[in-house]
Structures are given as structure tokens and as C-alpha cells.
Amino acid sequence: MDKFLIKGPCKIKGQVSISGSKNAALPILASTILFDKTVIIENLPRVKDIDTMVNLLKYLGSKIQFLNNKKTVKITKNKKQKIFAPYSLVKTMRAGILVLGPMIAKYHKSVTSLPGGCLIGARPVNYHLNALKKFGMIYEIKKGYIHATSKGKLKGTNIKFSNISVGATENSIIAACLAKGKTILKNCAIEPEIKNDLINFLNKAGAKIKWTGKRTCQIIGVNSLKETKYSVMGDRIETGTFCVAATLAKGDLLIKNFNPKLIQTELNLLKKTGATIKTSKDEIHIKGPQKIKNISNIVTKEYPNSLATDLQAQFMVLLCKANGRSTITESIFENRFMHVAELRRLGAKIIIKDNKAIIEGNTEFLGAELMSSDLRASAALVLAAIVAKGQSVINRIYHLDRGYEKIENKLRKIGVDIKRLS
């Protein structure tokens, strides 16, 4: 099992190019189940979750051709299509549930394994199931599988999500594209991966989707979607991770291929810690401060209201080095402080009270052997090791490989002493 060896502290300097967005690419790939025509998706990140989704589509009957060093995929439908998404392909990836909506919309039946992914809270699928039930889906769960059918074409409906859910919003939008009539979705997630990418992709293919309010989406069903080519947006969380790295390590970093407007909340927080930030259309130039300022009362919330939950762990590492006490409240997931125990091994002084982390600053990290627990926690451990004194070993980095494209190569180019060991 691979691990990282990092020798710190490291100074970050140079430039990094952001890969395509995993969280945008996954629902776009799942939605290709709706198509009879060829679809070409460009700017894919080369990460494990993308490989898993592509393998799932291949298993279901799509013909897959990789181009441009696997950053582009050409997807063509075979005549024979399966409606069974097995546990072996869905168990490692939360986004596996996203094939349920398009399969029901296209084929009116599906047997889909309950999904896996990072073990950060319950992350219930009931939001997906309750929404798809409104379209006319009938289902039962047996032995870890969702057995679903519909009596012919799905019917447009009105749905107000009881909680804002990224996955349920995506599944509902995708399913509604081929449903009969009009669908109104209220209290939708409006992350850029949905609003700027999934919907743009589907509309380019002939779907009829528009926003009628801040969190209200209208979809008019169509009979079919046309052949299309689309390039996935840059990865918002990778961008945020590198922004934190530069701030943490007193760096001077130019981040390319990402629209800074899509991460403005996090950039504003980094400015509060003392970072100097200049932006242009698709670049961020960030310089870390000599002394990091603390921040009180950060709360993770749904986009765009506050810090993204996927960047909470990275910001916690940054605040360990700040000049005073900081707090982070995690309001999205109930079990997303699993990185804290590992940060304590490096010397962090963090107290957890329910869903709030109280972080004492001025921590001198000392290298240690660490264990990754999930994707974003793994990134946080890498950041901490970069500024720790001495050698750190990070185990179970397969979590990182699920969401970051060759992160060690990118870090090495900007000054980090990092090696992958097998």
C-alpha cells in the first residue's frame, strides 16, 4: 500500500496548474446514460474516482475510448445496456448513486448498490430516493441494493428538498431531463459544479434547464439529448488546497486554470489570515504571510455562504499555525473531524466539542507517522507535514488518489520534498 514520505519544513514557490474537477466530472459522466449519441468529455482529472465511474459506465454497456493521455473520454452507447450497478464498482465511490436517476429516466428500471466513499457521517441516500420517488420511481432496498422501477416515462414534478443536498440535486436534474413535462426543484444545491458545469453540459446537449430563483431550478423534459463535446471546469477543492498550502508555508504561488470568483469566500478567509492575493480571469497569485492571523467562528455551510466542508480540514491545519485561538464549526457532516487525532500526533492543540473544533495557534509541528482517514483529511495531513520539522510518513494515501491528480508531482515542482513509497 503506497505512502508519502515528506521532509519539512518546505518553502513553496512557483506555479501550479489545476486539474479538471472531480466533483463536476462525476455527475456529467453519470448523465451520459441518458444519451443515445456520442459524448466527448474533456479536461478529466486522472484520479481513481473518475476511473471507477468510467469503469461503471463501461460495465453498464457504454463503449469507452480514452484520448489525450486519458484526460478526454469518448462515450458511445452499445445496443445492449445493463441496468445493474454492482457493489464492486460502487463501494469506493459516493457518486455511484448518481447512475440511479439516469437509469430510471432512460430504462425505467435499475438495480444499484448502496454507495461507498469517505466515511464522514451518515450521508444518507434517502434524499435521492425521496426525490426520485416524486418522479414516479418505485423502489425497495434488499441486501444492500436499491431495486427500482417506474411505470414507463418519469413524470415532471415539484420537489422542495428538506435539506440542501448536492447529490440529490444532481440526480433530480439529470432524471428530469427526460421526464414528461415540467419539473420545479426548490432548495437546490448551487455549487459551481452543478450550476456552472452539469447544467451547462446538459443544456448544450439539448436539455431545457434554467434557474428561476437563487435555489430554484426549472427543467422541461425532452425526448432525447444530442451528440456533444464538453470541457470540465477546474477543481475548486484542489485550488483551495493549494491556496491554503501557499498561505501556510509562507509561499509565493501562481495558481492557473481556475476562475477565482468560484472560490471567493475561501480567498476572503485567507486574506483575513494575512495572505496577499491577486486574481485575474483564470489565475490566483497568492503570497503567504510571515505571521498567520487567527480567525474566530468559521462555520462550514452550503455554497456560497461560508467555508466549503471539503476545505475544513485544510483550514484547520492553517489555523494551528495562527497567532491565537480559532474555532471551526462543521455544520454539513457530523463526523468530519477524524483528522484531528492525527494532527495531534504532530503536536496540534485542538479540542472538539460536539461539532466545534477549538484550535490553539502557534503550534510547532514535529514530523510523525500518520494515517489517512478520508480524502480531504489526507490533504490536510500532507499540508501539515509540509510545514512540520522533520520527516513525516502518511499512510493509506489511496484516499488522496481518489480526488487529487498526481499531487506529489505538483507539490515537488513547487518546492516540497515528497516521495511516494510503495
Where are these regions (language model features)?
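Short, structured segments at the rim of ligand-binding sites
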Residues: M1-S422
